[in-house]
Amino acid sequence: MGKNDERFEFYFDCFVFFYDFCRRIKQRYDSMENTGKIFGISLGPGDPELITLKALKALNAVEVIFCPGTKSGEGRMKSRALDILRQLEVDETKIRLFQVPMSRDRQEALCAYDRVCGEVLELVRSGKSVGITAEGDACFYSSAHYMYGQLA
């Protein structure tokens, strides 16, 4: 094999490597293009008039909104977050209320979060944008806070 043949083989191998590298990046980019986004949306201290403009824009922009609630002693679902969303006139067809069991045994709540995370990931993988609401700040002791680790 001559020197020119060796160079050709070297450059050809480099070209194949670079082509394959670019193809893998494009595949990854294409798969990300169809991926939705997840937003933790803070609803503020309880008064709907105190929600930030950015949170309100996020509520209107997302396609699905997960909203935590609890069951009352009579077995009815209650959700302060849902009450706020209704006062803000958010499209109720986008809202998915989920139950967070209030118990000293946190395992029940963690199981509920696992179920919701599965739904969220399925929606995001199908290209939907999803919001998870929280009374107060979504980063502190909220349902969104507990789910961030699983969704990351």
What is the predicted function of each stretch?
Residues 13, 29-31:
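Compositionally biased, intrinsically disordered low-complexity segments enriched
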Residues 4-5, 19, 29:
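Acidic/polar hotspots within intrinsically disordered regions
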Residues 32-48, 53-56, 60-152:
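Class I S-adenosyl-L-methionine
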